[in-house]
Amino acid sequence: VQAATERAQEVQSIIGAWSDEPMNMCRTPENLALLEKVRQSTALKDISKYLGRFREIFAQAKKNSYAYGRGETYSLELGNNLSRALTSELAMLATPETIPLFLRKYQQKQIKQYRRREPIYKGMGDIICCLDESGSTEGDAAAWGKAVAMTLLEIATEDHRSFALIHFAGSSSCQVDIFRPGEYTLEDKLSAAEIFLGGGTNFERPIREAIHLMESEGFEKADVVFITDSECALSDGCQQELQASQAAHHFTVTGILLDEGQADMDFSLKPFCQNIYRASELTSDALVLITHM
């Protein structure tokens, strides 16, 4: 019985993470081929552990119409609508000590919740994700970062935006995968997810690749997400190039630290990131905000 349960959980994890129809658990030819592919790849199985959950978070956000345009600030309100409550509020239900506090806030309509919005489209730009694949990220950090990247790809595609994934490690290790809406397959996505470069860390190569995409590949309205676990300084020349490009294209750089709780790791991102999040502190609510730049 335990083996059958574990097998069913594995199927649900893989289909929920990678399928174009994550709620369809039927033994279709597409699902069977997907299961076989992912089962043969340790990297894809590891990513599945996080990706399915991330897809659920954003599906719920979309269902509840938390649609915010590029550069628009999200807003909260107080109430007792549990479908729009922040996950940090619902977390009070997890322990007996905080349940009375939650119930009191619920009765008084003091639950923090998203202000409901009508679905809107405000011409959001493309997304460029720079993903650190140096040797130090191998394991859970690499799987978590790749799951974030794959979620950003899905969101970009749904919004008819282009997406670029810049895999980076040392100064000579860099690979770029470009995904245009309607022009890539599931196999393309799986292939990109399996890539792992290994080696050292260099921030300048991915920064310059991102600038090149904006200037030469039609990503001039893109924003950048920069995911890393490492510390690396940019030269004055590279910082000047980035500042000039930001002035010309009006984009932001959002940094995500795979920090494992290390308190002082953000200093190397501060010179070029307008927003910095820590993986160790990210809530479901913060994950929603990262994708609505």
Predicted regions and their residues:
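VWA/integrin I-like adhesion module and closely mimicked acidic/polar interface patches used
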Residues: L197, S230-S280
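Acidic, Ser/Thr-rich peripheral helices and adjacent loops at domain boundaries
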Residues: D177-I195, C273-L282
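C-terminal helix of von Willebrand factor
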Residues: N202-R208, M265-M293
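A generic secondary-structure signal
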Residues: T151-I155, E209-S216, A244
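Acidic/polar low-complexity segments with low predicted structural confidence
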Residues: V1-M124, S284-I290
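Von Willebrand factor
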Residues: G123-R180, T185-I227, C232-L234, I256-M265
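Arginine/glycine-rich "motif VI" loop of SF2 helicases in the C-terminal RecA-like domain
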Residues: A156-E158, F219, S245-F251
